[in-house]
Design a protein with these regions (language model features):
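Structured domain cores in non-transmembrane regions
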Residues: 200-277
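N-terminal intrinsically disordered, low-complexity, charge/repeat-rich segments that act as generic
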Residues: 2-132, 274-388
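Short N-terminal edge-element motif at the start of the domain
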Residues: 136-227
Length: 388
């Protein structure tokens, strides 16, 4: 059972029991560790070293939250001073502000705002992530955790122990690489890198052609496609994926692939059929030195028109078709429904401003024509138009 602590300045502090920690891969609290509370943060000391930090909801009126992290923070002067980690650093008073600067190590568990995450800070990998629907309170957490524990098998515990003790691994990637990713606790999905923006940005031809729709993407960007396929194992015949539909191409930072969160399981050369699912963005230029144009980016196809032509249509929802957002995680909302229905309708119900959505077919036709392309043609057909 969870230990429920007394109130302190409107805070109800909950501490997991060691028996419960094993289900989350968390380090047990040793019997000789001493507890110190600073506002809504609970610290556990092993002598003068802080070994664990648990953060609770700040006030009783807030939604229930729980974040448990392992740390290794040395203190001095009767635990009132945090010692620096480097020679250049300066000692700091141990207070709430100081605790926000602690660097987590190893396993951590987060339950906050309906999100659940079990992860390893050292390897930068996530073992499990989900979003729980319902009113955010401790009862909802208890229901989730009871189900989690009851469904945990010995094999699950072994996998969690392996995950806990992994070292950080990096993997090289290239266009065409097929990767696997976890869906829920025991299923896998599959994706493919169709444009390695990181590498292409280094090419003179890429810069010469501007490619603003790709160049403006933040960070170490990749364009990937996610297949309509789910499996209880990542060990599949990747040739099967060639026969699968996919979600529309999306931009994602490379972190989860680079740090092996999404293991690469093979390579299938990128074809123009893959590029039919390519990323599509239309926008007026945001480049101060090239502000008199608007552009369309369709995969590696880049086209421009005078801004004056684009402005004639700005009242027609066109500004919403700029599609240059990017994050660390794949956008797989609706993937299960899309896979079952063999359709991307559910995806487009969520991503309503995507120009590739069927409901925007008329706008897509007009926009493609304005930029010298043809929305009725596939990617290969539009490549041929560009050569004329």
């Amino acid at each position: 059972m969870m230990k429920k602590q007394s109130r302190n300045h409107n805070i109800i502090k909950i501490i997991l029991a060691n028996e419960e920690r094993k289900y989350l891969g968390l380090t047990p609290i040793e019997s000789h560790w001493e507890r110190v509370d600073i506002k809504h943060v609970t610290l556990f000391f092993d002598g003068d070293v802080i070994r664990k930090k648990i953060t609770h909801a700040e006030f009783e009126s807030q939604q229930f939250s729980y974040l448990e992290e392992d740390v290794c923070v040395e203190t001095a002067e009767n635990r009132t001073i945090v010692l620096p980690k480097t020679l250049r650093g300066k000692p700091k008073k141990l207070n709430y502000t100081a605790t926000t600067m602690f660097t987590r190590i190893g396993m951590y568990f987060m339950y906050n705002d309906g999100y659940v995450k079990i992860a390893n800070a050292t390897t930068q990998k996530t073992h499990y992530w989900t979003r729980i629907e319902g009113e955010e309170d401790k009862k909802l957490f208890d229901e989730w955790f009871d189900t989690w524990k009851n469904e945990t098998t010995e094999e699950d515990l072994r996998e969690l122990e392996v995950f806990k003790n992994e070292t950080r691994k990096k993997q090289k990637y290239k266009e065409g690489d097929v990767f696997a990713f976890k869906i829920g606790r025991r299923n896998y999905g599959f994706g493919k890198i169709i444009i390695d923006v990181v590498s292409r940005r280094k090419a003179e031809e890429f810069r010469k052609n501007k490619n603003y729709g790709l160049a403006h993407l933040m960070g170490t960007a990749l364009i990937v496609k996610v297949y309509h396929k789910m499996s209880d194992t990542k060990d599949i015949d990747i040739a099967e994926l060639e026969r699968c539909c996919s979600l529309p191409g999306q931009a994602v930072m490379d972190n989860h692939i680079y740090y092996n969160q999404y293991p690469i399981i093979g390579n299938l050369p990128v074809s123009n059929v893959d590029m039919n699912d390519a990323y599509l963005s239309v926008s007026r230029s945001i480049n101060y030195n090239d502000s008199d144009i608007a552009y369309l980016q369709y995969g590696l196809i880049y086209k421009e028109i005078p801004l004056s032509e684009y402005k004639k249509h700005e009242e027609e929802h066109w500004p919403a078709y700029r599609n240059e957002g990017i994050g660390f995680c794949l956008d797989i909302d609706g993937l299960e429904d899309c896979t079952k229905e063999k359709s991307n309708d559910k995806y487009f119900e969520i991503n309503t401003n995507d120009l590739r959505a069927p409901e925007h077919a008329k706008d897509r036709e007009i926009i493609f024509k304005l930029f010298g392309l043809d929305a009725s043609l596939d990617y290969q057909g539009n490549l041929e138009l560009c050569k004329q």
